[in-house]
Amino acid sequence: MYSRYILTGALLMLALKGYSQTDTASLDSVFKDEELKEVKVVARKPGTSRLAGAVNGIAVNKDELFKAACCNLGESFTTNPSVDVAYNDATTGARQIKLLGLSGTYVQMLTENLPNFRGAAIPYALGYVPGPWMKGIQVSKGSASVKNGYESITGQINVDYLQPEDEQQVEVNLFGDTKSRIEANADANVHLSDKWATEILLHHENILQNHDDNGDGFYDMPGREQYNVQNRWVYKGKNYIFHGGLGALKEIRTSGQDTEHVHSDDIYRIKLHTNRYEGYMKHAFILNHEHGTNIAFMSSASMHQLDAQYGNKFYDLNEKNLYSSLMFETNFSTQHNLSLGVSVNHDYLGQRANVNVSPRPTVGLEESPYLLSDMQRINEKETTPGAYAQYTYTLGTKLTAMAGVRIDHSSIYGNFFTPRFHVKYSPIDAISIRLSAGKGYCTVFALAEYNYLLSSGRNLNISKDLKQEEAWNYGLSTAFYIPMFGKTLKLNAEYYYTSFENQAVVDYDANKELIAIYNLRGKSYSHTFQIDASYPLLRGLEITAAYRLNDVKCTYDYGKSLMEKPLTSKYKALFTASYKTPLGLWQFDATVQLNGGGRNPESYQLADGSPSWSPRFHSFEQVSAQVTRWFRHWSIYVGGENLTGFKQKTPIYGASTPWGSDFEPTLVWGPVEGRMFYAGVRVHF
């Protein structure tokens, strides 16, 4: 036992030596929503399960995360048919989740049921959550619950970290791949008493060498070095529960032209220096154990600092966020649950940039465009207090209905109303039908959220009067549990429709000289249909097959044309197989993906008369595989990703002239790197 205290203290001292600490731990929600409960099954523990409440979604546990390298949150959905993770930019490595055919700005990101990763963190947040830190992920589709705010339009992704109160142990995870990337992770927790526990989480990663495998003179992916640390505490008494923690992150990304192939003093360089600090606390006062009556106060704060250079464009940011929520919840009986709460969210973005943008009139700056040589201050802020009420009716296992409303007041946009409704009906145990309808809103801090677009040679033109994004989402899903040959076939089919009333449109089509962001003038919608099935074919062998069809369109060119959303695949097919030997010593996992083609932005004519790029991109396949050998206190794994070796032929257009308007690295629709092999070891004691 004392060795664990010593190791935990050593890890804490090492973290303090690495850099100053503050932040990101989130606690697992003291009072989880009913929809976050999982269906329990017997036999080999499945890596995913359906959420048991009225909200449609899935829960992903560590068994699923172990099926791939899963170095961070962005690499945790390789085997998931519902969630796509795509690169937005070949030079910065910006990546976003796509859910229901729409980008991650419409997916509310939570860490242990606290809103997180806003503004400038959005393009890079998937790399801020190390995979070995995660205990599980819940993906809710549609408008989700009103408890956590109004921002969920296509869904919520909630990350649960390893907990201080988990079984005491020390874990170490080491990883390396053939692209010169190395990672080291460590975590340790100690039970200080029967009520108090603490843990330390450490992460370091480094890409030791840049690569230019396609010979275009630019690095295929940015160099990246990251330090990440969290310290978390928990107290669990009979009538009072506390969770709290601090965390800090430091990351440096470097990219641009390969200096070995460019003999010039005028090298195009990209540098992003990020410092992020977070802190949170949760207090739960249990008033009545029999009825689950409790009052809870939750609060989180973060500061995100970014110092960025994109060629001769510069962007500096100091972003601060404060969120607090006071909640009351009780079960009047086994059938009736009521949740009430108030919350406040405050965002402040202090920015400096030398780009052509038009800020909101509330900032008090002139409307005239800025010269490239001028650094301008662009300060934005919003405070949004609100209140919600949510009622849940449960009739045994047959029916669960949840209705919630929010009323919020934005210091920019005034009052707005958020209704949401979910129902689950099970006529028999083998069938579940879910319906949902709800509204969601997003405030757009365009320059922060789309700062990776500054790497383009085009000018970035942001409208000065962007409205709050506003959309309705409707969903229908059915789940079948079909007995077949002594086992159960799990079959799921779902359809979702998202319709925007207001949207910040990112337009590549209107003008070859600029990328424009402006208010929607016309229609914008997404239709998504998905069917998936899983079956334990043999003892220890689980297979999953899925197909998803997307129809995503938006009105571009300032209201002139309703077109397919660019860089969005029309469909996706996925097949996974996972086999674990009877004694559990060996595990074999494989995933095959077929990603459909889609539309590229409107091309234009180059000086030589040729088109800048093809009007459409084609479908492509990807294969990944991993073999794991399990031992009592450790495991070793080897694998490969993108084994088909497919790469987008031209991830950077105009690479030979990076200082011109033809330079375009942000039109990424496929892999930018070829085959990659990796190996790692996990040790716990």
Residue ranges and their predicted role:
Residues 74-115:
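Extracytoplasmic beta-strand/coil segments of soluble accessory domains associated
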Residues 394-397, 495-499, 519-604, 682-684:
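Gram-negative outer-membrane beta-barrel transporters
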Residues 35-68, 96, 137:
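N-terminal periplasmic "start-of-domain" segments of outer-membrane beta-barrel proteins
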Residues 294-308, 426, 434, 467-525:
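Membrane-embedded beta-barrel scaffold of Gram-negative outer-membrane proteins
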Residues 543, 594-603, 628-685:
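C-terminal beta-signal and adjacent terminal beta-strands/loops
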Residues 114-141, 229, 463:
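Short acidic/polar hinge/loop motifs at secondary-structure boundaries
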Residues 73-76, 95-98, 125-130, 139, ...:
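N-terminal periplasmic accessory domains that precede
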Residues 24, 207-228, 234-295, 301-319:
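Flexible loop and strand-edge segments within Gram-negative outer membrane beta-barrel domains
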